[in-house]
Amino acid sequence: MTGQSVSGARVSVIGAGKSGVAAAILLAGRGASVLLSELGSLGEDEIERLRQCGVGVESGGHSERALDVDFSVVSPGIPPSASAVKALEERGIQLYSEIEVASWFCRARIVGITGTDGKTTTATLVHDIAAAEGSLRGNRAWGVGNIGVPFSAMVGEMEEGDTAVVELSSYQLERCVTFRPDVSVLTNITPDHLGRYDGSMERYAAAKFRICMNQKEGDTLIYNADDSLLEEHFGGGAFPFRRVPFSLEEPPSAGVMHDGVFLRDGEIVVARDGGERRVARTDGFLKNSFRGRHNIYNALAAVAVSEALGIGDGVVRDGLGAFQGVRHRQQFVRRLGGADWINDSKATNVNAMRQALEAVEGKIVLIAGGRDKGNDYRPVLPLVAEKVELLLSIGESRALLAEAFKGVARIQEAASLEGAVSLARAAAGEGWTVLFSPGCASFDMFRNFEERGDHFMQCVNSLEE
């Protein structure tokens, strides 16, 4: 399927989330006959808006009309086990993701970024650097995808010479078929969302690897060489595209390294075709909400992307120096009673929690918990034992966390996030850090990690001096 062949096609879009709605409007605008099919309910205003855009709408279930189509677009939140998905597959209907559909109409160069952790920060940083470079040439950079704005909602405004920075989840990549980024990035792969993949890391990784499955000569894959799974898969063998590893360690053969980005004595170094150049010092950009070992990885990835896009080192240095981090990722909230309060609501897995604990110096009151995803907390036990004075567990997993960290740190269960904030205020001493890094999903108490983080910040900012 291509953008030229959708006119007149009968299409269903399963799921009326943001990306599903955007895909439906895009396809209808390109001449397809589109039915947006939603299992839940839709508001009358939303239905009317969609109809004005030429989109047919049904809610409360999926009818025969949603199955009698030429192809279907499945929203990322719809699991493969959903009855509508199964019914479409049984009929041999081709299923696509919203990302795939948007790519058919994209005139901009595409940077696709995925990974378990770091993809939002890396995508935001790459976007900011590309936007600064684009402003010098009269072009634009667009931050879309899992970062918050659907690719399909913006693709019609993109021009040749623009840069689309697309953050991609494994869910969004599952139904990609022809999607081909000019530059793809794999930040890391650690256990997460395994329930969707029947507990299989292999299936989860395979979904992530789809980001580069269509890349060819002239395209670039950037990957974290310190991630053993990624290095094993991409470090050897033959691939049609250029591979650029990034690492905190200087390669033994750095002097003759063809392509790569690494850290040497606090400086980010780019190696290419036997030569190398220094781009930026880490002490020039690590600060406040953008600090820690994991953010050096994010910076390395962004530098590698910038090099692949031909962005000048001066623009890259300025972009790194100006970057303030992203909301809900180790975000400084305030200092109260001599203690720093940090919002890390985006830490929805154990590895992200580990990164936050590594980044904080001094004594910590840790607020953690939510909806557990089959987490293995053993990797963070040494850090918790070393740094955490009090662990306040919340949400569905509060008893599970209390058991997992029993004997490692002092633990207290809190009935709510507000209660945890009050307990943390009473416990935190001068020079301590109150770190909200849940390590779990948010869906037990909140719609998403953004709502959870906003609520935490509201609670903290309501505390009196």
Curated annotation (Swiss-Prot):
Q: Which keywords label this protein?
A: ATP-binding, Cell cycle, Cell division, Cell shape, Cell wall biogenesis/degradation, Cytoplasm, Ligase, Nucleotide-binding, Peptidoglycan synthesis
What's the Enzyme Commission number for this chain?
6.3.2.9
Residues the record lists as binding ATP: G115, T116, D117, G118, K119, T120, T121
From the Swiss-Prot or TrEMBL record, state where the protein is found.
Cytoplasm
Name the Gene Ontology biological process terms. cell division; cell wall organization; peptidoglycan biosynthetic process; regulation of cell shape
Tell me the superkingdom of the source: Bacteria
Which molecular function terms from Gene Ontology are attached?
ATP binding; UDP-N-acetylmuramoylalanine-D-glutamate ligase activity
Q: What class of enzyme is it?
A: ligase
Q: What does it catalyze? A: UDP-N-acetyl-alpha-D-muramoyl-L-alanine + D-glutamate + ATP = UDP-N-acetyl-alpha-D-muramoyl-L-alanyl-D-glutamate + ADP + phosphate + H(+)
Metabolic or biological pathway: Cell wall biogenesis; peptidoglycan biosynthesis
Known function: Cell wall formation. Catalyzes the addition of glutamate to the nucleotide precursor UDP-N-acetylmuramoyl-L-alanine (UMA).
UniProt lists the family membership as follows: Belongs to the MurCDEF family.
What is this protein called in UniProt? UDP-N-acetylmuramoylalanine--D-glutamate ligase
Organism encoding this protein = Chlorobium phaeovibrioides (strain DSM 265 / 1930) (Prosthecochloris vibrioformis (strain DSM 265))
Its gene name is murD
